[in-house]
């Protein structure tokens, strides 16, 4: 026991010496529990973010280090119009570079998450492309589809964890969107529908590529895709599409913001590095992923966040008391 205490003292001394040789540690004196922090955050009036001004979505600062991206066309059931496909890309490109943001919650305003693509607004682009030459029309449509695909790929490429909070219907493009998110919560009344076959086309902006890897049950994915049937909340939970189901939207959003607060209290170097490596590992072999991880961590292991975390643990302080620098 005495030997262990001596080793711990020496390790603590070494950590303190290294910290003094770089920069001073600053601790957040607040030791509030996650639940109390989440309750306070849920009561806080959201503040609009000045550099996020959009027609189809609304971005607010839900709490410290957490942004709330809300699909904001409730009168149109949050249908995805022309502006949406452009604005969501711009939004997440900004979030990716926002050093103050550490987690994002995505939800829908009104009675449902989204009804999918706004066919009334997008019909001319898709059904009446410009030109009369088959090859040139094909090039136009390929470019159009590629731009739509980028709308959701930008979520996946954003290093900050993205939590989808789904209520009511999540139809068509909505499934493409949530498949690109990192964590999915839903309400008991939520349903999910790969709707594209009902309008005569194959889903082309991410569902067919990501959903099999999210659920891990190709037979079920094929069934949902070929029939456009609704998957209800309980089945979504059983299949792994969502990780938790809540009785209503308010309870779900409070839980999503609490989760985001918990994530944002961790080292952003560790969290964002974990997301990047999880996605890389999904698409590569174990050996390739291990090699990528080794290359990644040969620089990331030099972060002061490790020293701060170890010191807090040895001093038996709440990890939420640590102040991590922006990333």
Swiss-Prot record:
Question: What is the recorded phenotype of mutating residue 176 to A/D?
Answer: Strongly decreases dienoyl-CoA and trienoyl-CoA isomerase activity
Pathway listed: Lipid metabolism; fatty acid beta-oxidation
Q: Please tell me one Gene Ontology term that the record gives under cellular component.
A: mitochondrion
Q: Where is this motif: Microbody targeting signal?
A: 325-327
Compartment list:
Mitochondrion; Peroxisome
**Tissues expressing this chain:** Expressed in heart and liver (at protein level).
Keyword tags: Acetylation, Fatty acid metabolism, Isomerase, Lipid metabolism, Mitochondrion, Peroxisome, Phosphoprotein, Transit peptide
Gene3D superfamilies reported for this sequence: 2-enoyl-CoA Hydratase, Chain A, domain 1, Lyase 2-enoyl-coa Hydratase, Chain A, domain 2
Give the reactions, separated by semicolons, that this protein catalyses: (3E,5Z)-octadienoyl-CoA = (2E,4E)-octadienoyl-CoA; (3E,5Z,8Z,11Z,14Z)-eicosapentaenoyl-CoA = (2E,4E,8Z,11Z,14Z)-eicosapentaenoyl-CoA
GO BP: fatty acid beta-oxidation
- Annotated effect of mutating residue 204 to A/N: Strongly decreases dienoyl-CoA and trienoyl-CoA isomerase activity
Which family is annotated? Belongs to the enoyl-CoA hydratase/isomerase family.
Protein name, UniProt field: Delta(3,5)-Delta(2,4)-dienoyl-CoA isomerase, mitochondrial
Organism lineage reads as: Eukaryota, Metazoa, Chordata, Craniata, Vertebrata
């Amino acid at each position: 026991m005495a030997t262990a205490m001596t080793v711990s003292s020496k390790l603590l001394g070494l950590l303190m010496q290294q910290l003094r040789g770089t920069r001073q540690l600053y601790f957040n004196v607040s030791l509030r529990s996650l639940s109390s922090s989440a309750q306070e955050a849920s009561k806080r009036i959201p503040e609009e973010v000045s550099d996020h001004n959009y027609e189809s979505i609304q971005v607010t600062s839900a709490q410290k280090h957490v942004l709330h991206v809300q699909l904001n066309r409730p009168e149109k059931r949050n249908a995805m119009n022309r502006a949406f496909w452009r604005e969501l890309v711009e939004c997440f490109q900004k979030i990716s570079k926002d050093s103050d943001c550490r987690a994002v919650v995505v939800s829908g305003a009104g009675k449902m998450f989204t009804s999918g693509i706004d066919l009334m607004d997008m019909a001319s682009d898709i059904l009446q492309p410009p030109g009369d030459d088959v090859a040139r029309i094909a090039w136009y449509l390929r470019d159009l589809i590629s731009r739509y695909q980028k709308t959701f790929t930008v979520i996946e490429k954003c290093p900050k964890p993205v939590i989808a909070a789904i209520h009511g219907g999540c139809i068509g493009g909505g499934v493409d969107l949530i498949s690109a998110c990192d964590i999915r919560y839903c309400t008991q009344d939520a349903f999910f529908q790969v709707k594209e076959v009902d309008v005569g086309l194959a889903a082309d902006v991410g569902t067919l590529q990501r959903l099999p890897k999210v659920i891990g049950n190709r037979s079920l994915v094929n069934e949902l895709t070929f029939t456009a049937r609704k998957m209800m909340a309980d089945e979504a939970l059983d299949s792994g599409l969502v990780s938790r189901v809540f009785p209503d939207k308010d309870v779900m959003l409070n839980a999503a913001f609490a989760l985001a607060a918990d994530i944002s209290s961790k080292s952003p170097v560790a969290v964002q590095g974990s997301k990047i490596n999880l996605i890389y590992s999904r698409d590569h072999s174990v050996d390739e992923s291990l090699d990528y991880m080794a290359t990644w961590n040969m620089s990331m292991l030099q972060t002061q966040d490790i020293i701060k975390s170890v010191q807090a643990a040895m001093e038996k302080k709440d990890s939420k008391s640590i102040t991590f620098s922006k990333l």
